[in-house]
Swiss-Prot record:
Its EC number is 2.7.4.8. The gene is gmk. It comes from Staphylococcus aureus (strain Mu50 / ATCC 700699). Residues 6-185 form the Guanylate kinase-like domain. ATP binds at G13, P14, S15, G16, V17, G18, K19, G20. Belongs to the guanylate kinase family. Disulfide bonds: none annotated. This is Guanylate kinase. One of its GO terms (molecular function) is ATP binding. The keyword Cytoplasm applies.
Length: 207
């Protein structure tokens, strides 16, 4: 039978919810076969991050030039910085039958939904907004004013979870990782995804 086209897996949620930590845990698992689509951003690199591994870090001018060339599936400006997903890698990798994993901001996920309505959208939620505030303070990288700005934005983003197919609470990283992997596995078994393949198999068997 022909190879099944890959899934586009979109993980997003409020800043500070732990998207990057959960994504790293998923890709540390030897059983993970997803291809990670690295996002591009104009924000400053954080301690421990690697250019070309965690993000492609670009200047604002370079990023805006790529916008003009229509080189993004999605892009958004969030708290003064651009974030975007390069388009060609995603399309090529899915056509090869690989699942592509995107870790992006909520505004970006809205754009992806319009262009890839069949993608799998997972909202990573904090146990509470107080818990989220503690995580942001614990980073020690931002002012109180910036943290409050992120909390205000998080409130709006939580209200937008109806745009997603699944909600995973990040109360513990390993549990969140396992939940996401189970969701992806179940998605591959949906009748809508496999029916055409098996109908083709039956028709070929009758020849």
């Amino acid at each position: 039978m022909d190879n099944e086209k890959g899934l586009l897996i979109v993980l997003s949620g409020p800043s500070g919810v732990g998207k990057g930590t959960v994504r790293k845990r998923i890709f540390e698992d030897p059983s993970t076969s997803y291809k990670y689509s690295i996002s591009m951003t104009t924000r400053q690199m954080r301690e421990g991050e690697v250019d070309g591994v965690d993000y492609f870090f670009k200047t604002r001018d370079a990023f805006e030039a790529l916008i003009k060339d229509d080189q993004f599936i999605e892009y958004a400006e969030y708290v003064g910085n651009y974030y975007g997903t390069p388009v060609q890698y995603v399309k090529d990798t899915m056509d090869e039958g690989h699942d592509v994993f995107l870790e992006i901001e909520v505004e970006g996920a809205k754009q992806v939904r319009k262009k890839f309505p069949d993608a799998l959208f997972i909202f990573l939620a904090p146990p509470s907004l107080d818990h989220l505030r503690e995580r942001l303070v614990g980073r020690g990288t931002e002012s109180n004013e910036k943290i409050q700005s992120r909390i205000n934005e998080a409130r709006k983003e939580v209200e937008m979870m109806n745009l997603y197919d699944y909600v995973v609470v990040n109360d513990e990283v390993e549990l969140a990782k396992n939940r996401i992997q189970c969701i992806v596995e179940a998605e591959h078994l949906k009748r809508e995804r496999v029916e055409a393949k098996y109908r083709k198999m039956i028709l070929e068997a009758k020849k």
